[in-house]
Design a protein with these regions (language model features):
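Short polybasic linear motifs
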Residues: 19, 23
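A cross-taxon signal for low-complexity, glycine/charged-rich
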Residues: 6-7, 17, 260
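Conserved N-terminal beta1-alpha1 strand-loop-helix module at the mouth
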Residues: 32-259
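Extreme N-terminal basic, low-complexity initiation segments
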Residues: 1-11
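N-terminal hydrophobic alpha-helix used for membrane targeting or insertion
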Residues: 9-14, 175
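Residue-level detector of alpha-helical hydrophobic segments embedded in or interacting with membranes
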Residues: 24-26, 217
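N-terminal amphipathic/hydrophobic targeting modules at extreme N-termini
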Residues: 3, 16-18, 28-31
């Protein structure tokens, strides 16, 4: 109750406005880009990102299924990690309108520079403990989104205030490590006021699969959904049939929502 009152109070709006102005002083204005892929907000059409692609077969299957963005993991401990050079080869297979998302976790300046030099990334995904200032510093004016590791009592308002200049917020489950655990979080715990205000740049992740993505879309109406382990036959191994079925489930959910 207190959170809902806070979200609608005049005092909260004033604090939010001051925080945004302070953020501009620290990291500059949030870059606005016209995305053809992942972050094109189009009511009635949920965008789809498939993350952790590692081979040309993965990329070709995702594109054939109608994906809007593919994610490449630049985090060596991950079983889905790829090198910048491999990512560059895979990105060259993408048609116009499909975003190449670069996922990094607490990358050093040198690591980030190597990725940027090799691969044509169109959207950066900061999935570690990066501060807003660090995200803006690394992205250097390029589009970026920040992953939120959502657990019990997660402070949604604080997060969106802190990272208010991100192009998108990616909601993932709080698990050991940094994502890819295939564990959903409690979508009902997301405050409706927060959803209403931020839905045009919310990317929902965390344990999505062909069986639950329809419910997730019906509840939250996110701009996009993000899947990785939910379309795998074993850890790190994507399945073309599951990728196609996942996107079909998203389109079915969109059609159902539009008809209501």
């Amino acid at each position: 109750m207190a959170g809902k009152l806070l979200a609608t109070s005049k005092g909260y709006r004033e604090v939010r406005a001051r925080t945004k102005e302070r953020a501009k002083e620290i990291i500059g204005p949030r870059p606005y880009h016209s995305f053809m892929g992942l972050l094109t907000h189009s009511p009635g059409r949920t965008r789809v990102k498939i993350c952790g692609l590692m081979s040309s077969a993965d990329v070709d299957s995702a594109v054939s299924a109608g994906v809007d963005a593919v994610g490449f993991v630049f985090y060596p401990p991950s079983v889905r990690a790829v090198s910048p050079n491999i990512a560059a080869q895979l990105i060259s297979r993408l048609p116009a309108g499909v975003d190449a998302v670069g996922l990094v976790v607490n990358a050093t300046d040198e690591q980030f520079a190597a990725i940027r030099a090799a691969a044509s990334i169109t959207l950066w995904q900061f999935h570690g403990d990066e501060t807003p200032e660090r995200c803006a510093q690394l992205a250097a004016g390029e589009p970026w989104m920040k992953a939120a590791r959502v657990g019990t009592g997660f402070a949604f308002d604080d997060f969106s205030l802190q990272y208010g200049h991100a192009n998108a917020f990616l909601l993932d489950a709080l698990v050991e490590g940094y994502g890819g655990g295939g564990v959903p979080f409690d979508w009902q715990g997301i405050p409706q006021t927060w959803v209403s205000e931020n839905a045009p740049r919310v990317v929902l992740s965390g344990g999505l699969n062909v069986h639950n993505v329809g419910e997730a879309i019906a509840r939250l109406h996110p701009c996009a959904v993000d899947v990785s382990s939910g379309v795998e036959i074993s850890r790190g191994v994507k399945d073309p049939a599951l990728m196609a079925q996942f996107i079909q489930a998203v389109r079915a959910a969109d059609a159902k929502t539009s008809s209501q």
